[in-house]
């Protein structure tokens, strides 16, 4: 990591930048943008939940990559809990620089003993990164169900 790259927790003051960064993620999934009120409500929920953290890569004061890590307490594996990483995103102008890898390595070095990761099916470069970091796509099978929109 260069001196210009900082990996850190996202703070409330970063929310506008984080939401702008996630436009790169949500556009691919054709998701509508959140209102300011929705963003603030979600942030308050995150602040109240000690097991949820957003991590970011900052370069020259700008957030250019981020993801969320959720750690859930567990009675398995000595009570160390398990983590789930989701919503890994890098700003399109900063891709192919190894920033997502640095972010993931940081999290893997500082989190619990078991970490799962969810990724879209058609993201071959991201999947290669995750496999290079030791994630095993054959170890378990994941299922996702979305609630119908009202």
What does each model-found stretch correspond to?
Residues 6-20:
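A short beta-loop-alpha structural element at the N-terminal edge
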Residues 23-43:
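Conserved GNAT-fold acetyl-CoA-binding loop/helix
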Residues 44-56, 84:
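A short helix-loop-beta-strand connector motif used in the catalytic cores of GNAT acetyltransferases and
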Residues 56, 62-71, 84, 89:
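Conserved beta-strand in the GNAT
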Residues 73-85, 95, 138:
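A conserved beta-turn-beta hairpin within the catalytic core of GNAT-like acetyltransferases
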Residues 94-106:
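Conserved acetyl-CoA pyrophosphate-binding loop and the N-cap/start of the following alpha-helix
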Residues 101, 117, 121-139, 145:
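Conserved active-site alpha-helix within GNAT-family acetyltransferase domains
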């Amino acid at each position: 990591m260069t001196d210009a790259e900082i990996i850190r927790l996202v703070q409330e003051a970063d929310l506008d930048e984080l939401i702008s960064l996630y436009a790169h993620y949500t556009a691919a999934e054709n998701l509508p943008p959140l209102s300011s009120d929705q963003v603030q409500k979600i942030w308050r929920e995150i602040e109240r939940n000690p097991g949820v953290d957003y991590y970011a890569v900052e370069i020259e004061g700008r957030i250019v990559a981020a993801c969320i890590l959720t750690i859930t307490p567990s009675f398995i594996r000595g009570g160390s809990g398990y983590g789930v990483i989701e919503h890994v995103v890098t700003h399109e102008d900063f891709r192919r620089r190894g920033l997502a890898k640095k972010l993931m390595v940081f999290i893997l070095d500082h989190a619990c003993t078991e970490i799962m990761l969810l990724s879209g099916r058609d993201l071959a470069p991201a999947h290669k990164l995750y496999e290079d970091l030791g994630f095993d796509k054959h170890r378990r099978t994941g299922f996702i169900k979305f609630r119908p929109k009202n």
